[in-house]
């Protein structure tokens, strides 16, 4: 998937309304070049252009954005027009030049509409006439990638992105062109580009973000060219049978809550074509009520995307790049469109964080809201986001305490996520103090770095990043979930058992079947506050049962510098063995290994001035392995990151249990340390006839227990005893606190 083009896509969408702040004749902007109904702008109407031209300069955010885009375009115009024959892969010269060109086309159309300066029309006209000469001569790209190479770019996705953006600029100048030039450009650039996309079912007729870009490009071009056939194909699929197309994608790719199947990273990427095309549909066919489809799921998706971030960065599940966040250009479009339609002032605070807007009617509304001081803080809240078109294919559980930079626990109980999905059912991540504490590797990729295979996904994305051992979840017999076959994974989703989001207690639980033949595992995690603990702690219980004895590995990938290991282990200092041969194990160095034992152990590390104590145990004897990624990596494609692996051998059932405690402060500048010692004295797990319980003992002797029933649907009473202390509760789960010295608890 090529995000480099996308970035520019929105950069120029920002340009499509970007240059409005120059001194301008509103009257001229409203009626450029004697527009006719067959050539007048349809993606942004003449009346909307007029309002931006007359009002935009009064609003600082709009004015700043216009000035930025004007400077960008003038620099490109000064450099001259360059429409090279395509020959390079991603990151190469011709690839990057064609990206700059669609930026320029979009910006030129915007500037013309907002200033009336005919230089911008002439610049875009001359560039498009060069494309009209070039495009009919192009076959498959010489560096073609994937089943369907592009024409202008090495993968067809980039051709779609080019068209989405360039057609917006063309729409703005089309009525200002001589009829002969307009016909030449229609017939030799935009129509054949759209027809090429629509003629490739392996790209066009799919339920996938690549197809979203293709149908959006085709449909927007159809509106501009007044071609209802292109519009219908884009909405209903190339055969116009409603099996594919934009409407089907809206119905299948989002859950009722607005969660996108491939995860936040690709939700970000897909939002741009979804919302830009939806806006075009609304302008041209409002009777379709596209923004009301499925109870407004497209606008829900904008809110969900912000919710699936921490301190400005998206949760990096599945194929994701760690530094993508809410300031991404795709979401700039989303925030503008969502705010214009909803008036939700929380979105203005996100726009402030983004530091920019689009020069569109929607961007103008954002600028007006910001100028009026309407921005309200965005409320990041705990929530369960259902997955699947009907909301019954698992979900993403988000537990939060302490505000935007406080504690956030993410339990990934979602669908596979198609080809970009990782094999990590019931995986989890944890954030605290503005940092990634329990981590997900994301993808193995250097976006736009030509030296790293042109910026595409590296071989290590398959051999490491997608593999189960690269995540914080159960591995059986050193194999990945579904044996590493995502198509099998698509057929099996976790079952959400329960979700609770209280003030001091937040709990998520899910069960996974069929990730391995004959294996069922259930994970229950809680974020718990207590007056004697300075910060919330994470309690984790993972229960496994199998129909035959197996090796069970449970990794914990963490971020920080190890302070202490509370267990005896053999250290490999003279040589560094590799943990295994395949399925990601070949990329792990083994640094230390304990003997098998049943007593809980501890591991502590330091991250950004805060200590983290991890106390862990299992119901069967386990080894503790300290490992680091980066083995068998001759091209240095992998980051070196530590992990702890709990290993249980030769068992049919086991329960892993742990608590992660943030605490204390280290200040190297002021040379002090506070609260370096854990406030948790003991961790125990016990089993009743139909339930399990994990008990924490604090330094004062007070206890916190979490009881979890085997059957989450039954409203019956459960009893579990821990060293003579009985805990009773009714229902799926319960938190039970007990002061120091107290007896049985209910």
Regions from the PLM with identified roles:
Residues 64-86:
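Short alpha-helical hairpin
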Residues 356-575, 652, 662-665:
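Catalytic and substrate-binding regions of extracellular carbohydrate-active enzymes
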Residues 644-654, 660-746:
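Non-catalytic terminal regions with compositionally biased, polar/charged low complexity
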Residues 2-28:
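Gram-negative bacterial Sec-dependent N-terminal signal peptides
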Residues 556, 613-631, 654-666:
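Short, hydrophobic/aromatic-enriched beta-strand segments in well-ordered soluble domains
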Residues 30-40:
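Cleaved targeting-peptide boundary
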Residues 186-425, 429-436, 570-584, 588-608, ...:
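Extracellular polysaccharide-recognition and catalytic grooves
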Residues 41, 46-57, 62-65, 77, ...:
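Aromatic-lined, polymer-binding surfaces characteristic
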């Amino acid at each position: 998937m090529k995000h480099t083009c996308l970035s520019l896509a929105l950069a120029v969408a920002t340009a499509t309304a970007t240059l409005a702040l120059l001194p301008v004749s509103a009257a001229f902007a409203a009626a450029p070049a004697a527009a006719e109904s067959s050539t007048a702008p349809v993606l942004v109407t003449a009346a909307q252009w007029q309002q931006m031209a007359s009002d935009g300069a009064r609003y600082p955010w709009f004015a700043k954005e216009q000035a930025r885009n004007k400077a960008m375009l003038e620099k490109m115009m000064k450099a001259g027009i360059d429409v090279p024959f395509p020959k390079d892969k991603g990151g190469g010269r011709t690839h990057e030049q064609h990206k700059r060109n669609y930026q320029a086309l979009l910006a030129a159309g915007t500037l013309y509409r907002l200033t009336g300066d005919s230089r911008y029309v002439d610049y875009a006209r001359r560039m498009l006439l060069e494309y009209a000469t070039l495009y009919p001569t192009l076959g498959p790209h010489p560096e073609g990638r994937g089943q369907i190479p592009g024409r202008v770019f090495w993968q067809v996705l980039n051709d779609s992105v080019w068209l989405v953006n360039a057609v917006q600029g063309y729409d703005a100048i089309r009525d200002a062109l001589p009829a002969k030039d307009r016909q030449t450009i229609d017939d030799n650039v935009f129509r054949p580009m759209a027809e090429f996309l629509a003629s490739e079912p392996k790209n066009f007729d799919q339920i996938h973000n690549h197809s979203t870009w293709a149908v959006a490009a085709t449909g927007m071009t159809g509106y501009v060219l007044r071609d209802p056939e292109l519009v219908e194909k884009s909405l209903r699929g190339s055969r116009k049978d409603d099996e594919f197309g934009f409407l089907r994608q809206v119905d299948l790719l989002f859950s009722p809550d607005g969660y996108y199947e491939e995860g936040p990273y690709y939700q970000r990427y897909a939002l741009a074509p979804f919302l830009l095309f939806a806006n075009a549909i609304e302008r041209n066919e409002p009777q379709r009520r596209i923004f009301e489809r499925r109870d407004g799921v497209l606008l829900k998706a904008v809110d969900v995307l912000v919710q699936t971030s921490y301190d400005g960065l998206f949760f990096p599940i599945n194929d994701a790049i760690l530094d993508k966040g809410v300031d991404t250009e795709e979401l700039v479009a989303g925030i503008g469109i969502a705010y214009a339609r909803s008036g939700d002032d929380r979105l203005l605070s996100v726009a402030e964080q983004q530091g920019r807007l689009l020069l569109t009617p929607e961007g103008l509304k954002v600028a007006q809201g910001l100028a009026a001081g309407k921005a309200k803080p965005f409320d990041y809240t705990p929530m369960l986001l259902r997955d699947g078109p009907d909301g019954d294919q698992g979900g993403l559980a988000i537990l939060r305490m302490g505000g935007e930079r406080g504690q956030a626990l993410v339990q990934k109980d979602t669908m596979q996520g198609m080809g970009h999905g990782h094999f990590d059912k019931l995986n989890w991540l944890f954030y605290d103090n503005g940092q990634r504490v329990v981590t997900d590797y994301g993808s193995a990729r250097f976006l736009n770095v030509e030296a790293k295979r042109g910026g595409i996904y590296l071989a290590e994305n398959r051999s490491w990043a997608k593999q189960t051992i690269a995540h914080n979840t159960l591995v059986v017999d050193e194999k990945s979930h579904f044996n590493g076959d995502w198509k099998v994974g698509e057929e099996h989703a976790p079952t959400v058992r329960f979700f609770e989001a209280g003030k001091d207690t937040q709990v998520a639980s899910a069960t996974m079947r069929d990730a391995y033949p004959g294996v069922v595992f259930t994970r229950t995690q809680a974020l718990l506050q207590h007056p004697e603990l300075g910060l919330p702690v994470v309690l984790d219980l993972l229960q496994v049962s199998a129909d035959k004895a197996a090796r069970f590995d449970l990794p914990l990938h963490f971020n920080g510098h190890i302070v202490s290991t509370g267990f005896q282990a053999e250290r490999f200092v003279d040589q560094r063995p590799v943990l295994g041969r395949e399925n990601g194990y070949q990329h792990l160095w083994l640094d230390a290994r304990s003997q098998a034992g049943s007593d809980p152990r501890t591991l502590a590390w330091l991250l950004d001035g805060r200590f983290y104590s991890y106390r862990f145990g299992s119901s069967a004897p386990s080894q503790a392995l300290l490992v680091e990624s980066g083995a068998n990596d001759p091209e240095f494609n992998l980051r070196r990151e530590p992990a702890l692996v709990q290993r249980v051998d030769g068992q049919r059932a086991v329960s892993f249990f742990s608590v992660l405690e943030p605490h204390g402060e280290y200040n190297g500048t002021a040379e002090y340390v506070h609260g370096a010692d854990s406030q948790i004295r003991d961790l125990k797990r016990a089993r009743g006839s139909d339930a399990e319980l994990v008990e924490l003992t604090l330094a004062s002797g007070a206890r916190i227990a979490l009881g979890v029933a085997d059957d989450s649907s039954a409203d019956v009473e459960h009893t579990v005893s821990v060293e003579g202390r009985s805990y009773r509760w009714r229902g799926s789960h319960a938190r039970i606190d007990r002061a120091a010295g107290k007896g049985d608890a209910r």
